[in-house]
Amino acid sequence: MEKLKEIEKESIFPKGEEKLLTEKGHPYRERNKGIIALLITTIIWSLAFIAQSTAMDQIGPCAFVFYRHLLSGLCLLPFAFLKPCSSEEKRAGIKGGALTGIVLGLASVIQQFGVKETTVGKAAFLTVLYIILIPIFGLIIGKKPEKKIWFCAILALVGVYFIAIKAGTKFTIGRGDMYIILCSLLYAIQIMQVGHYVKKVNISWYMSIQFLAGSMVGLLGFLFFEKFSFMSLKAAFLPIAYAGIMSGAVAFTMQSYAQKRLEDTLASLLMSTTAIYAAIWGWLFLGESLGIREIFGCIIMTIAVVYAQLPEKQRKRS
């Protein structure tokens, strides 16, 4: 009987991932809960691109980032006070959250400028580039990536070419596309910061301060380059509320819940589907369309993103 349980465990989780099993509940049931939670999370994130795009008709990019991250931070801040932690963990969480939040704020502002000048589908797919960029940045700081990463990086660039470069034109990229690519670079840095701090700090303080710091970046741009309008804020209330509460506070919490129950490879694969959902929502709700050339680029880029996350052992077995 014990042997059968071990076989069942190994069939669900790769070797070394048994710790993902919870103390209570059937492993299949817990794993399915994680899959469902992460699929819902990716849908929430993908719909945020719609919120970002529609909000631009009412308020400026910096104002949207300020309101969005401020709302996310305020939603999570009570949990920081409720969860007990040492003063050292609290200080580390605040410091790490502030540093990460600055990068998050810059990435969010630049992304908003990009969304304003390109389609939702393009913005989502180009943002996914951070999954390829993270291992490359790792090489710069001394973490040698697998050889397949270089192949995936080149393949992703080919995909970007077909998505962003119009047929019959010289090698030029639209301004909106450049904003999104720069945004993906910053998101790659932000994700690496999260990986550095997450095991060393109090998560509740870290996440709430990260959002609040990000909102301050948006506030600076808002004060210097944009004008406040109560009517514009009122008109953009729903997109701001969705991005701040659902995409920020709720989705990040669901991601944490899901990744406690899933192996990292599966979780990453599920999260990469955000771009696909975003393209669908742009077509359904905003009347956007992707031409054959751009769809081909999206397919190539999806292959690169997915292949980059498959472990060597899994590919050899297949």
Functional labels for PLM-detected ranges:
Residues 67, 109, 123-129, 194-215, ...:
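Helix-helix packing/entry segments at the starts of transmembrane helices
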Residues 2-3, 8, 14-15, 19-23, ...:
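C-terminal-most transmembrane helix of multi-pass membrane proteins
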Residues 2-63, 102, 106, 110, ...:
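Glycine-/small-residue-enriched transmembrane alpha-helix faces in small-molecule transporters
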Residues 32-37, 63-78, 95, 148-155, ...:
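Hydrophobic alpha-helical transmembrane segments of multi-pass integral membrane proteins
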Residues 44, 48-49, 77-127, 162, ...:
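Specific transmembrane alpha-helical segments of multi-pass solute transporters/efflux pumps
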Residues 76, 145-165, 184, 218, ...:
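Hydrophobic transmembrane alpha-helices of multi-pass small-molecule transport proteins
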Residues 75, 80-84, 130-151, 276-295:
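C-terminal transmembrane-helix exit sites in multi-pass transporters
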